[in-house]
Amino acid sequence: MGKIQELSPELINQIAAGEVIESAHSVVKELMENSMDASATQVDVESKDGGLSLLRITDNGTGIEPEDLEPALKRHATSKIQDYKDLESVLSYGFRGEALASIASVSRLTLESGTKEQKTAWKTRSVAGKISEKEEIPGFIGTKILVEELFFNTPVRRKFLKSIRSEDKKIRDRVTTQALAREDVRFRLFQDGKEVFVLPTRENKKERIIDLFGENFRDHLLEVSLERGGIQATGYISDPDFYKSNRTGQFIFINGRPIEIKYSSVLLKKAYDELLPPNGHPYCFLFFEIDPSRVDVNVHPAKREIRFLDEDGFNGFFLALIQKELRSSTPVSFLELKKRLLKPAPETHSTTSFYQARSSGKNPLLGRELFSGVSKQEGFELDRMGPGVSLSELTDERVKHSSFVPKKHFGVLFETFILAEAEDGFYIIDQHTAHERIRYEEVLRKLEKRNYGIQPLLTPIRIDVSKQEQEDILNRKKEYEEVGIFLDPLGEDSIVLREIPAYMEPGQEKEIVLDFLNRTEGKETSEPELYDLMAKCVACRSAIKKGDQLSDPILAEILNRLSYCENPSRCPHGRPTLVKLSRDDLERMFHRK
C-alpha cells in the first residue's frame, strides 16, 4: 500500500477551518457577513465564555430555502458566485463557500432558517461536520445559527486561545468593525447574558462612530471625501490634536469589506507629516468604493487582505484624500501647526481623550536643577520625580555591575552627550538614555518591593473613553491598582484618576497613565510585565531630554547612578546609553600602537 493517502472529508474541513476560523471572533465575523449578504437589517450576537461554549447569531435576512440547508454546510458550496468571471467582480462579503463548513467541522452547530415564501422554517444540525436530516419548525423570516463547544474535537486549538476576557474583546471588536461598515443595520451584542451594546440604525456614519467610541469624538472628526480615477472615498479622520499611541483606532473598508492594507499606517503618518508627534497615530474611518475588477479579494482565506491592480495609484489617492482635508481645515501652515504643537500645554486637569497623550513639547526641567540638594547620608535625589533611591541604599544592596566606574567628566557635547573618563577608558554617554535607564531601574525596584506610597490628587483627572473602553479598563481595575493607579467610572463613557503612586511627580501623571493604558490595551499581562511597562512609561516621560542644560553636580550624579545600574549600557527600549573608547583604541587611532 502506498504512503500517500487521500484525506477524509472531515480532516479536509478541519484543515480548512484552521485557515478560516482562528477563534470565536472569526466565527462571528463570518456569520455576520452572511447576514449582511442576506440583506439583514437586524443582527443579534450572543456569546458565552468567550464564544467557546456558545455563539448565537440571529438575523432578519432573506433566509435559506429548505433544499439549501444541507448544501450550505458543505465546503465550496455557495450562492455568491458561479464561475471565474463572477470572482473578478465579487461584491458580496462571502464567496468562497468555506465558512459554514469550516465552522461546522469544529463545533456542534444548529442552523435554523425561514423565508417569506415558506409558512414554516427548517432546522438542521451538524456535529463535527456530520449533517443530520432537516426538520420542520414554526415559521419565521431570517436565520439563526447556534455554535456550541467550538473546537471540541480539536483540543490543541483550544490550548492556543487566550483568556475568556481576551476572546470577549475580540468579539466586541469584530462587531464594532462590522457596525462601522453598516450604520443602516441595528446591532445588538450580549456576552454571558449581559447587554454590551445596542446600536440603533443611523442616518450617517458619524453618528455610528459616536455611538461606538463616545461623544468626545464629535468635535474631533474631520470629514473627508474624494473621487477620481475610478475610486470614490468618504469617511472621517481625527484632527491633529486627537490621536492614539497605537494603531487600533484605524478602520479601512474597501467596497464595504474591512481590510488590512499594507502600509496604511505609514501612509497616514506621511499624510499628517509634522502634525503628529513621532508616537502619535490618528484615528481614521475610511470607506473606499472601487471597481471590483481592479481589486483582488481572494488573497487570504479569511479575506483580511486585498491586492490592488494599481497599488501605487491607490496609495497616491489615499494620501491626497487625507492631505486635502488637513490643508483645507487648517487655517495656518503645517509649519505653524508644528510650532503650535511644541508649545507647552496649559497646566490643567481638563477633559482629555483616553488615547490623547501629548507631551507639552517643552521639558519642565529646563532652567532648574534636576536633582535636589546634597545629603551626605542619602546622596542626590531626582527633582520632580518624587523620592529617588539613595546611593547608600544602592551600595548596601548591590555592587557595581560593570567596569564603568567614572572618575571625572569633561562636560557635554552638542547638549546631548556627556564626555567622561573611567578606569577602563573614555566614554560618551547619551544623557537622555542614561537617565532613562536610571529611572527605569529605580521605579522597577520600587514596584517589585512595593516600596512606594499612594498620594491622592487634589483635582481628580477625568479621561473620556468609549463604553467598551471603560468596561475594559474597569475589568482590569485590580491589576492597575497593583502599580498604584486608582481609576473609577464616571458616567458611561469616562473614567477618573483619583490617586497615583508616589514614584510619579504631580504634573506628569496624566501622560504616564495614558501611555500605560495604551500599552496595556488588549494585552494579557502578568504582574512582572505590568511592572516593566509602568517602569518604562515613567522612565520615558520623566528622563531628562536632549538639549536640557545640566550642571556639573548633576552630570556627576547621573554618571554615578548609572554605574550602579544592572544594565548601564542600554536604555529600557534597547538603545545604547554609552560608547566606550579604551586607551588601546585611542592609541591605535593615533598610530601609537
UniProtKB/Swiss-Prot annotation:
Molecular function per GO: ATP binding; ATP hydrolysis activity; ATP-dependent DNA damage sensor activity; mismatched DNA binding
Entry keyword Chloroplast: no
Any Pfam family: MutL_C
The keyword rRNA-binding belongs to this UniProt entry's keyword annotation: no
GO cellular component terms attached to this protein's record: mismatch repair complex
Keywords: DNA damage, DNA repair
InterPro entries given in the database record: DNA_mismatch_repair_CS, DNA_mismatch_repair_MutL, DNA_mismatch_S5_2-like, HATPase_C_sf, MutL/Mlh/PMS, MutL/Mlh/Pms-like, MutL_C, MutL_C_dimsub
GO biological process, one term: mismatch repair
PANTHER family in the record: DNA MISMATCH REPAIR PROTEIN MLH, PMS, MUTL, DNA MISMATCH REPAIR PROTEIN MLH1
HAMAP family for the chain: DNA_mis_repair (MF_00149)
Role this protein plays: This protein is involved in the repair of mismatches in DNA. It is required for dam-dependent methyl-directed DNA mismatch repair. May act as a 'molecular matchmaker', a protein that promotes the formation of a stable complex between two or more DNA-binding proteins in an ATP-dependent manner without itself being part of a final effector complex.
Family according to the record: Belongs to the DNA mismatch repair MutL/HexB family.
Protein name as catalogued: DNA mismatch repair protein MutL
Organism: Leptospira interrogans serogroup Icterohaemorrhagiae serovar Lai (strain 56601)
Gene giving rise to this polypeptide: mutL
